[in-house]
From Swiss-Prot:
Gene that this polypeptide is encoded by: ndhL
Any GO MF annotation of the entry: oxidoreductase activity, acting on NAD(P)H, quinone or similar compound as acceptor
Cell compartment(s), UniProt: Cellular thylakoid membrane
Protein name: NAD(P)H-quinone oxidoreductase subunit L
E.C. no: 7.1.1.-
Length: 77
């Protein structure tokens, strides 16, 4: 049992899992959530989303060149 806790490989895997969740998974879920609910969010939901954006800002910055939250428009003009 002690060899499990002293194993540097398990520690490395744990760090990779935590960092990938923080920088990749949750920011993509936030982008998806904001893109689908931007115009129909309530004030408390928006406040919570702003808090999550503040918390996961580094991951959102990584994806910002590739994703955007622009409105689709009506197609006229």
């Amino acid at each position: 049992m002690e060899s499990i806790f002293n194993n540097s490989f398990a520690t490395l895997i744990a760090y990779i899992g935590i960092i990938s969740t923080y920088l990749l998974v949750i920011p993509l879920l936030l982008f998806y959530w904001m893109n689908n609910r931007w115009n129909i969010m309530g004030k408390f939901e928006r406040l919570g989303i702003y808090g999550l954006v503040f918390l996961f800002f580094p991951g959102l910055i990584l994806f910002s060149p590739f994703l955007n939250l622009r409105l689709k428009g009506t197609g006229k003009g």
